[in-house]
């Protein structure tokens, strides 16, 4: 899991591709997951990278990871104060 995410982030950083990835911990994120596109997908470097390629349908918004799966992509998160 960590290796796939790390490799994807390094790949995107070199190409200046932005990505917002959120890992669910103690605070549930179900309300935010429901604002995005459900994925329920295994995590891979290729999938993470492909989601955030500019001008693709899922690249806007956040990817939310629950446990060892991608729960949703293109999710809306609240703005900070």
Residues covered by each model-derived region:
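Divalent-cation
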Residues: 1-81
């Amino acid at each position: 899991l960590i290796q796939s995410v790390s490799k994807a982030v390094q790949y995107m950083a070199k190409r200046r591709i932005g990505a917002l990835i959120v890992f669910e911990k103690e605070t549930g994120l179900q309300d935010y997951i429901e604002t995005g596109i459900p994925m329920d997908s295994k995590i891979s470097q290729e999938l993470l990278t492909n989601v955030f390629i500019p001008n693709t349908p899922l690249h806007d918004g956040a990817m939310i990871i629950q446990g060892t799966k991608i729960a949703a992509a293109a999710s809306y998160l609240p703005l900070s104060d």
